[in-house]
């Protein structure tokens, strides 16, 4: 039960309760939930969310903003994370070639004529392309593993450039992940995968949902805490 509001850059879940007498808007672990009396009309729920959307965006933003990664210059020798390990950026002169990961190095090949700001821009572009592909590959593999454990089959696995969320699962079984997660530890990626795959059985954040997550990953709270504290560091 998730009403749609145009131009809203976060999703929210509606939980209806016969015991609830008033409307309540809450944020837990980066997820927005509105708890309302059973017969509350959607228009009243939407009005509440619209009224407090700036507050919600602020709170969600705070979770992704602490601490922040230092801006990159995209020059040789800089360090970039991949699956929690630092990789040194190496720039080689030659014909255009896709970025390659060689050991603990990310190797970009560019023409010698490309210098200054144009070179840095191209390096950033190559890095972004590589991270998107690497993230998709990792998430497809990990989603397959966790889906099999639950006996579910997602209809689509994709990566996106989310600003305020780490993943989502539609009621149709389409799972999307924030590609930046591939920068951090593999265990944190696994937590988000376990979280989203669990939504295929429980499309909410009820106690039953969290029990499924815990069955898949008993120490999920550790990964959750890491993400809440260091999520803002996942940037290139």
Sequence positions of predicted segments:
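Walker B catalytic acidic pair
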Residues: 196
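Walker B beta-strand of ABC/ABC-like P-loop ATPase nucleotide-binding domains
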Residues: 193
């Amino acid at each position: 039960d998730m009403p749609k509001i145009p131009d809203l850059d976060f999703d929210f879940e509606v939980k209806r309760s016969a015991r609830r007498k008033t409307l309540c808007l809450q944020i837990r672990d980066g997820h927005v939930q509105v708890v309302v009396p059973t017969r509350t009309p959607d228009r009243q729920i939407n009005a509440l969310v619209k009224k407090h959307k700036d507050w919600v965006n602020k709170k969600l933003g705070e979770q992704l903003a602490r601490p922040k990664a230092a801006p990159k210059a995209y020059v040789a020798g800089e360090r970039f994370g991949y699956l929690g390990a630092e990789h040194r950026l190496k720039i080689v002169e030659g014909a255009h070639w896709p970025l390659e990961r060689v050991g603990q190095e990310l190797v970009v090949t560019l023409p010698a004529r490309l210098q200054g700001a144009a070179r840095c821009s191209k390096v950033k572009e190559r890095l972004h392309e590589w991270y998107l592909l690497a993230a998709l590959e990792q998430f497809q593999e990990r989603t397959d593993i966790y889906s099999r454990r639950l006996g579910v089959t997602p209809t689509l696995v994709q990566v996106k450039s989310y600003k305020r969320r780490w993943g989502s699962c539609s009621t149709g079984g389409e799972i999307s992940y924030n590609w930046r997660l591939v920068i951090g530890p593999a265990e944190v990626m696994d937590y988000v995968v376990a979280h989203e795959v669990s939504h295929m059985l429980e499309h909410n954040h009820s106690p039953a949902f969290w029990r499924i997550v815990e069955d898949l990953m008993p120490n999920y709270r550790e990964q959750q805490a890491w993400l809440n504290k260091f999520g803002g560091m996942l940037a290139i």
